[in-house]
Protein backbone atom coordinates (compact mmCIF):
# COMPACT_ATOMS: atom_id res chain seq x y z
CA UNK A 1 0.00 0.00 0.00
CA UNK A 2 1.10 3.56 -0.62
CA UNK A 3 0.71 6.87 1.12
CA UNK A 4 2.10 10.38 1.00
CA UNK A 5 4.21 11.58 3.90
CA UNK A 6 3.96 15.24 4.89
CA UNK A 7 4.98 17.37 7.83
CA UNK A 8 2.17 17.96 10.35
CA UNK A 9 2.15 21.69 9.66
CA UNK A 10 1.48 20.98 5.96
CA UNK A 11 -1.11 18.26 6.53
CA UNK A 12 -4.21 20.43 6.17
CA UNK A 13 -3.05 21.94 2.89
CA UNK A 14 -2.03 18.57 1.43
CA UNK A 15 -5.31 16.95 2.50
CA UNK A 16 -7.22 19.57 0.49
CA UNK A 17 -4.91 18.98 -2.47
CA UNK A 18 -5.46 15.21 -2.40
CA UNK A 19 -9.23 15.76 -2.29
CA UNK A 20 -9.14 18.25 -5.14
CA UNK A 21 -7.32 15.87 -7.48
CA UNK A 22 -9.40 12.89 -6.35
CA UNK A 23 -6.67 10.55 -5.11
CA UNK A 24 -7.39 10.48 -1.37
CA UNK A 25 -8.23 6.87 -0.45
CA UNK A 26 -11.26 7.13 1.81
CA UNK A 27 -11.24 3.41 2.56
CA UNK A 28 -8.11 3.66 4.68
CA UNK A 29 -7.11 5.79 7.66
CA UNK A 30 -4.27 8.29 7.84
CA UNK A 31 -1.62 7.74 10.51
CA UNK A 32 0.43 10.37 12.33
CA UNK A 33 3.24 10.84 14.80
CA UNK A 34 4.76 13.94 16.40
CA UNK A 35 6.29 15.22 13.15
CA UNK A 36 4.52 13.61 10.17
CA UNK A 37 1.16 12.56 8.75
CA UNK A 38 0.79 9.83 6.12
CA UNK A 39 -2.33 10.02 3.96
CA UNK A 40 -3.56 7.01 1.95
CA UNK A 41 -3.69 7.60 -1.81
CA UNK A 42 -5.08 5.70 -4.79
CA UNK A 43 -2.62 6.93 -7.45
CA UNK A 44 1.08 7.27 -6.66
CA UNK A 45 1.97 8.66 -10.09
CA UNK A 46 -0.28 11.68 -9.59
CA UNK A 47 1.05 12.09 -6.05
CA UNK A 48 4.64 12.12 -7.34
CA UNK A 49 3.74 14.58 -10.10
CA UNK A 50 2.54 16.93 -7.36
CA UNK A 51 5.94 16.77 -5.71
CA UNK A 52 4.74 14.73 -2.74
CA UNK A 53 6.82 12.10 -0.97
CA UNK A 54 5.37 8.64 -1.62
CA UNK A 55 6.07 5.87 0.89
CA UNK A 56 5.18 2.19 1.15
CA UNK A 57 3.20 1.73 4.33
CA UNK A 58 0.45 -0.48 5.78
CA UNK A 59 -2.49 1.81 6.55
CA UNK A 60 -5.51 0.51 8.50
CA UNK A 61 -8.86 0.05 6.77
CA UNK A 62 -11.82 2.08 7.97
CA UNK A 63 -14.94 0.21 9.12
CA UNK A 64 -17.40 0.14 6.21
CA UNK A 65 -19.78 2.55 7.94
CA UNK A 66 -16.99 5.11 8.38
CA UNK A 67 -15.58 5.18 4.85
CA UNK A 68 -17.31 8.44 3.96
CA UNK A 69 -19.36 10.25 6.59
CA UNK A 70 -20.42 13.18 4.43
CA UNK A 71 -19.48 15.26 1.42
CA UNK A 72 -16.98 17.23 3.48
CA UNK A 73 -14.78 14.12 3.49
CA UNK A 74 -14.76 14.03 -0.31
CA UNK A 75 -14.79 17.60 -1.59
CA UNK A 76 -12.23 20.39 -1.49
CA UNK A 77 -13.14 22.86 1.23
CA UNK A 78 -13.81 25.77 -1.14
CA UNK A 79 -16.39 23.70 -3.03
CA UNK A 80 -17.99 22.20 0.06
CA UNK A 81 -18.42 25.59 1.76
CA UNK A 82 -20.45 26.90 -1.18
CA UNK A 83 -22.48 23.76 -1.78
CA UNK A 84 -26.09 23.78 -0.56
CA UNK A 85 -28.07 21.02 1.06
CA UNK A 86 -28.14 17.44 -0.17
CA UNK A 87 -31.27 15.29 0.12
CA UNK A 88 -31.86 11.68 -0.88
CA UNK A 89 -35.33 10.66 -2.08
CA UNK A 90 -35.41 6.99 -2.99
CA UNK A 91 -32.58 6.55 -5.51
CA UNK A 92 -32.49 10.27 -6.40
CA UNK A 93 -29.98 12.72 -4.91
CA UNK A 94 -31.03 16.38 -4.90
CA UNK A 95 -28.32 18.95 -4.35
CA UNK A 96 -28.15 22.74 -4.34
CA UNK A 97 -25.26 23.91 -6.55
CA UNK A 98 -24.80 27.70 -6.81
CA UNK A 99 -23.88 29.09 -10.23
CA UNK A 100 -20.42 30.06 -8.98
CA UNK A 101 -19.38 26.40 -8.54
CA UNK A 102 -21.47 24.89 -11.33
CA UNK A 103 -18.25 24.35 -13.30
CA UNK A 104 -17.25 21.85 -10.57
CA UNK A 105 -20.36 19.73 -10.96
CA UNK A 106 -18.42 16.68 -12.19
CA UNK A 107 -16.40 16.72 -8.97
CA UNK A 108 -19.60 17.11 -6.95
CA UNK A 109 -21.35 14.31 -8.84
CA UNK A 110 -18.37 12.01 -8.29
CA UNK A 111 -18.41 12.71 -4.55
CA UNK A 112 -22.15 12.08 -4.25
CA UNK A 113 -21.81 8.78 -6.12
CA UNK A 114 -19.07 7.66 -3.74
CA UNK A 115 -21.12 8.65 -0.71
CA UNK A 116 -24.36 7.13 -2.04
CA UNK A 117 -23.44 4.33 -4.48
CA UNK A 118 -27.09 3.25 -4.88
CA UNK A 119 -28.15 6.62 -6.28
CA UNK A 120 -29.22 6.43 -9.94
CA UNK A 121 -30.17 10.08 -10.51
CA UNK A 122 -28.55 13.31 -9.36
CA UNK A 123 -30.56 16.50 -9.78
CA UNK A 124 -29.72 20.15 -9.18
CA UNK A 125 -32.23 21.88 -6.92
CA UNK A 126 -34.09 24.99 -8.06
CA UNK A 127 -36.89 26.98 -6.44
CA UNK A 128 -40.42 26.07 -5.38
CA UNK A 129 -43.11 27.59 -7.55
CA UNK A 130 -46.82 27.46 -8.28
CA UNK A 131 -49.89 26.40 -6.35
CA UNK A 132 -48.55 22.88 -5.79
CA UNK A 133 -45.11 23.99 -4.43
CA UNK A 134 -43.25 22.00 -7.10
CA UNK A 135 -39.50 22.44 -7.00
CA UNK A 136 -37.57 23.05 -10.20
CA UNK A 137 -35.08 20.22 -10.68
CA UNK A 138 -32.47 19.63 -13.39
CA UNK A 139 -31.06 16.14 -13.84
CA UNK A 140 -27.28 16.51 -14.06
CA UNK A 141 -26.30 12.84 -13.92
CA UNK A 142 -27.85 9.42 -14.38
CA UNK A 143 -31.26 8.32 -15.58
CA UNK A 144 -33.45 11.08 -16.97
CA UNK A 145 -36.32 10.74 -14.51
CA UNK A 146 -37.62 12.29 -11.29
CA UNK A 147 -39.92 9.50 -10.10
CA UNK A 148 -38.86 6.98 -7.48
CA UNK A 149 -40.01 4.98 -4.46
CA UNK A 150 -38.81 6.37 -1.13
CA UNK A 151 -38.53 4.15 1.95
CA UNK A 152 -39.28 5.70 5.33
CA UNK A 153 -40.46 4.52 8.74
CA UNK A 154 -41.50 1.13 7.40
CA UNK A 155 -43.58 2.43 4.48
CA UNK A 156 -42.99 2.89 0.75
CA UNK A 157 -43.76 6.28 -0.79
CA UNK A 158 -44.06 6.75 -4.54
CA UNK A 159 -43.12 10.27 -5.61
CA UNK A 160 -42.64 12.15 -8.85
CA UNK A 161 -40.61 15.20 -7.92
CA UNK A 162 -41.51 16.93 -11.19
CA UNK A 163 -45.20 16.94 -10.19
CA UNK A 164 -45.50 16.80 -6.40
CA UNK A 165 -43.99 18.27 -3.24
CA UNK A 166 -42.14 15.90 -0.90
CA UNK A 167 -39.74 16.62 1.96
CA UNK A 168 -37.59 13.65 3.07
CA UNK A 169 -36.23 15.65 6.00
CA UNK A 170 -39.52 15.28 7.85
CA UNK A 171 -38.93 11.56 8.41
CA UNK A 172 -38.19 11.98 12.12
CA UNK A 173 -41.05 14.42 12.61
CA UNK A 174 -43.54 12.06 10.99
CA UNK A 175 -42.37 9.31 13.33
CA UNK A 176 -42.69 11.63 16.34
CA UNK A 177 -46.29 12.47 15.50
CA UNK A 178 -47.14 8.81 14.92
CA UNK A 179 -45.88 7.95 18.40
CA UNK A 180 -48.07 10.64 19.98
CA UNK A 181 -51.20 9.17 18.40
CA UNK A 182 -53.39 6.68 20.26
CA UNK A 183 -55.23 3.74 18.74
CA UNK A 184 -58.81 4.57 17.87
CA UNK A 185 -58.24 8.24 17.02
CA UNK A 186 -59.85 9.98 14.06
CA UNK A 187 -57.22 12.16 12.43
CA UNK A 188 -57.31 14.87 9.77
CA UNK A 189 -54.27 15.70 7.61
CA UNK A 190 -54.80 18.70 5.30
CA UNK A 191 -52.15 19.51 2.66
CA UNK A 192 -51.47 15.77 2.67
CA UNK A 193 -49.45 15.51 -0.57
CA UNK A 194 -48.56 11.91 -1.42
CA UNK A 195 -49.73 11.05 2.15
CA UNK A 196 -46.43 10.49 4.01
CA UNK A 197 -47.95 11.59 7.34
CA UNK A 198 -51.08 9.41 7.00
CA UNK A 199 -49.00 6.41 5.92
CA UNK A 200 -46.57 6.63 8.83
CA UNK A 201 -49.35 7.23 11.37
CA UNK A 202 -51.45 4.35 10.03
CA UNK A 203 -48.34 2.16 9.90
CA UNK A 204 -47.98 2.30 13.68
CA UNK A 205 -51.50 2.94 14.98
CA UNK A 206 -54.99 1.55 14.41
CA UNK A 207 -56.63 4.84 13.46
CA UNK A 208 -58.81 6.43 10.81
CA UNK A 209 -57.04 9.18 8.84
CA UNK A 210 -58.64 11.63 6.43
CA UNK A 211 -56.12 13.11 3.97
CA UNK A 212 -57.01 16.21 1.93
CA UNK A 213 -54.93 17.30 -1.09
CA UNK A 214 -55.58 19.65 -4.02
CA UNK A 215 -52.87 18.43 -6.43
CA UNK A 216 -54.43 15.79 -8.70
CA UNK A 217 -51.02 14.20 -9.41
CA UNK A 218 -50.34 13.89 -5.68
CA UNK A 219 -53.79 12.36 -5.15
CA UNK A 220 -53.11 9.76 -7.84
CA UNK A 221 -49.78 8.86 -6.23
CA UNK A 222 -51.42 8.86 -2.79
CA UNK A 223 -53.91 6.27 -4.01
CA UNK A 224 -51.05 4.18 -5.39
CA UNK A 225 -49.19 4.54 -2.09
CA UNK A 226 -52.23 3.37 -0.18
CA UNK A 227 -52.38 0.24 -2.32
CA UNK A 228 -48.60 -0.25 -2.15
CA UNK A 229 -48.69 -0.25 1.66
CA UNK A 230 -51.99 -2.04 2.18
CA UNK A 231 -50.40 -4.96 4.06
CA UNK A 232 -48.19 -2.68 6.18
CA UNK A 233 -50.89 -0.52 7.74
CA UNK A 234 -52.73 -0.98 11.02
CA UNK A 235 -55.05 1.94 10.34
CA UNK A 236 -57.27 3.15 7.52
CA UNK A 237 -56.77 6.16 5.23
CA UNK A 238 -59.42 8.04 3.27
CA UNK A 239 -58.09 10.34 0.52
CA UNK A 240 -60.08 13.44 -0.48
CA UNK A 241 -59.19 15.44 -3.61
CA UNK A 242 -59.96 19.10 -3.10
CA UNK A 243 -59.01 22.51 -1.74
CA UNK A 244 -58.45 22.39 2.02
CA UNK A 245 -60.33 25.66 2.50
CA UNK A 246 -63.36 24.29 0.66
CA UNK A 247 -63.30 20.71 1.94
CA UNK A 248 -62.64 21.15 5.67
CA UNK A 249 -65.74 23.25 6.48
CA UNK A 250 -67.84 20.31 5.28
CA UNK A 251 -66.05 17.70 7.38
CA UNK A 252 -66.80 16.76 11.01
CA UNK A 253 -64.35 17.50 13.79
CA UNK A 254 -61.46 15.14 14.55
CA UNK A 255 -59.55 14.01 17.62
CA UNK A 256 -56.30 15.23 16.11
CA UNK A 257 -55.35 17.47 13.18
CA UNK A 258 -51.86 17.36 11.65
CA UNK A 259 -51.32 20.35 9.34
CA UNK A 260 -48.04 20.38 7.33
CA UNK A 261 -48.94 23.87 6.17
CA UNK A 262 -47.31 25.17 2.96
CA UNK A 263 -45.17 28.27 3.31
CA UNK A 264 -47.22 31.43 2.96
CA UNK A 265 -50.53 29.74 3.76
CA UNK A 266 -52.49 30.67 6.91
CA UNK A 267 -54.71 27.78 7.94
CA UNK A 268 -54.43 28.14 11.71
CA UNK A 269 -58.02 29.19 12.39
CA UNK A 270 -59.50 26.55 10.09
CA UNK A 271 -57.40 23.63 11.30
CA UNK A 272 -57.84 24.53 14.97
CA UNK A 273 -61.60 24.67 14.46
CA UNK A 274 -61.57 21.03 13.29
CA UNK A 275 -59.48 19.73 16.22
CA UNK A 276 -61.15 18.45 19.39
CA UNK A 277 -58.11 17.25 21.33
CA UNK A 278 -54.84 17.99 19.51
CA UNK A 279 -53.49 20.14 16.69
CA UNK A 280 -49.98 19.95 15.24
CA UNK A 281 -49.61 23.08 13.14
CA UNK A 282 -46.50 23.72 11.05
CA UNK A 283 -45.30 27.14 9.93
CA UNK A 284 -42.12 29.00 8.97
CA UNK A 285 -40.96 31.45 11.62
CA UNK A 286 -37.94 33.69 12.23
CA UNK A 287 -36.12 32.70 15.40
CA UNK A 288 -36.92 36.09 16.96
CA UNK A 289 -40.65 35.53 16.34
CA UNK A 290 -41.11 32.06 17.83
CA UNK A 291 -42.64 33.26 21.10
CA UNK A 292 -44.87 35.66 19.19
CA UNK A 293 -46.00 32.72 17.03
CA UNK A 294 -46.87 30.78 20.18
CA UNK A 295 -48.89 33.74 21.46
CA UNK A 296 -50.72 33.92 18.14
CA UNK A 297 -51.75 30.29 18.48
CA UNK A 298 -52.93 30.88 22.06
CA UNK A 299 -54.88 33.94 20.96
CA UNK A 300 -56.65 31.90 18.28
CA UNK A 301 -57.50 29.28 20.90
CA UNK A 302 -59.05 31.98 23.10
CA UNK A 303 -60.94 33.42 20.13
CA UNK A 304 -62.49 30.01 19.49
CA UNK A 305 -63.34 29.55 23.17
CA UNK A 306 -60.80 26.78 23.69
CA UNK A 307 -58.45 26.40 26.63
CA UNK A 308 -55.16 25.19 25.17
CA UNK A 309 -51.66 24.24 26.17
CA UNK A 310 -49.20 25.23 23.41
CA UNK A 311 -45.55 24.36 22.91
CA UNK A 312 -43.48 25.26 19.84
CA UNK A 313 -40.52 23.25 18.64
CA UNK A 314 -38.03 23.82 15.84
CA UNK A 315 -38.35 21.07 13.26
CA UNK A 316 -35.78 22.02 10.61
CA UNK A 317 -33.74 24.89 9.21
CA UNK A 318 -35.34 26.75 6.31
CA UNK A 319 -32.82 29.53 5.77
CA UNK A 320 -30.51 31.49 8.11
CA UNK A 321 -32.44 32.33 11.30
CA UNK A 322 -35.73 31.01 9.86
CA UNK A 323 -37.09 27.64 10.95
CA UNK A 324 -39.88 25.28 10.12
CA UNK A 325 -41.62 24.95 13.47
CA UNK A 326 -44.46 22.90 14.87
CA UNK A 327 -46.98 24.21 17.38
CA UNK A 328 -48.17 21.23 19.41
CA UNK A 329 -51.57 22.27 20.74
CA UNK A 330 -53.39 20.29 23.42
CA UNK A 331 -57.01 21.35 23.76
CA UNK A 332 -57.96 21.06 27.43
CA UNK A 333 -61.54 22.25 27.20
From Swiss-Prot:
EC number: 2.1.1.-, 2.1.1.228
A UniProt-annotated Pfam family: TRM5-TYW2_MTfase
Effect of residue 174 to A: Decrease in both activities
CDD domains: AdoMet_MTases (cd02440)
Miscellaneous note of the record: Less efficient than Trm5b and appears to be selective for methylating tRNA(Phe).
Record family assignment: Belongs to the class I-like SAM-binding methyltransferase superfamily. TRM5/TYW2 family.
Subcellular localization(s) per the UniProt record: Cytoplasm
Keyword Methyltransferase: yes
Entry binding sites for S-adenosyl-L-methionine: 174, 191, 213-214, 243-244
Keyword line: Cytoplasm, Methyltransferase, S-adenosyl-L-methionine, Transferase, tRNA processing
Name of the molecule in the record: tRNA (guanine(37)-N(1))/4-demethylwyosine(37)-methyltransferase Taw22
Any one Gene Ontology molecular-function term assigned to this protein's record: tRNA (guanine(37)-N1)-methyltransferase activity
A biological-process GO annotation: tRNA methylation
Function: Catalyzes both the N1-methylation of guanosine and the C7-methylation of 4-demethylwyosine (imG-14) at position 37 in tRNA(Phe).
